[in-house]
Amino acid sequence: MFVDYSGLERYTDINASFGKLVNTYCCFQRCEAISEQLEILKSLVPKCHDIVALTDEDFASGRTAGLTQKLFAMAMTLHQITDCIDLLQKCNTIIPIEIANPASFESGAATAPLRQSYARLLDDWSHYMGPSTVKHTGCTNRPKWRFPWQQSRTIIIPMLFIGETAMSTRDLRSVLHDCEIRHASEMPLQLLWTSSPELVYATPHVDDYDIWSRYGSDYNMQIEDEDEASKGRQRKCVVQLEALLGALPTTDPLFQW
């Protein structure tokens, strides 16, 4: 998946799509039955006939759990690419983000339809996200030459609420543990989840400690540069994703399962 760190309004649909998919991932993780997870998976790639044809029996083996998550991770990326392909091709300030691969799964335990579905999604995913394609589009270099200073930045994504799927900030942190940042730069990036709309355009001074303290102690205060510091304008480095504010409509077909 992708997020845009420019803060430009014309690219906010990229971040809105990312936010919806993160909520979908939360719902997927909370499902207690494989049938519920399968319905969500099918809703992401409705034109992939191999996925649509899968049944509960294809996931009968307990050893295919890791494969299920990998299918879902690739499906989310493909859904966002389909949803925002024009913007993604134009945007020079995107960061690729993927759900981390499961530790292991046994492909031999999967049924033939499940292995075929995996091969189909992997082929489509590799077309857009493979090393050669990413290198060709310059995704791996974007964070390195687009950031104005060599320090950490924090991407603040306001938390979304959709019916009964509302999650607490603490719960969302567990989702972040399953995410990895995919880029070649050595510059560390963080994702901070919050439910507070007042942080949309927040660039607080360092002494505004109480603003950030309630969102966890692992944040990173940074100074933009020496000139800014000399003027007393020490600020937290923030990339604003304003498109994710507010509640998404429950009529969104992505969440009708």
UniProtKB/Swiss-Prot annotation:
One cellular component term from this protein's GO annotations in UniProt: cytoplasm
Family stated for the protein in its record: To yeast YKR015c.
Protein name: Uncharacterized protein YJL043W
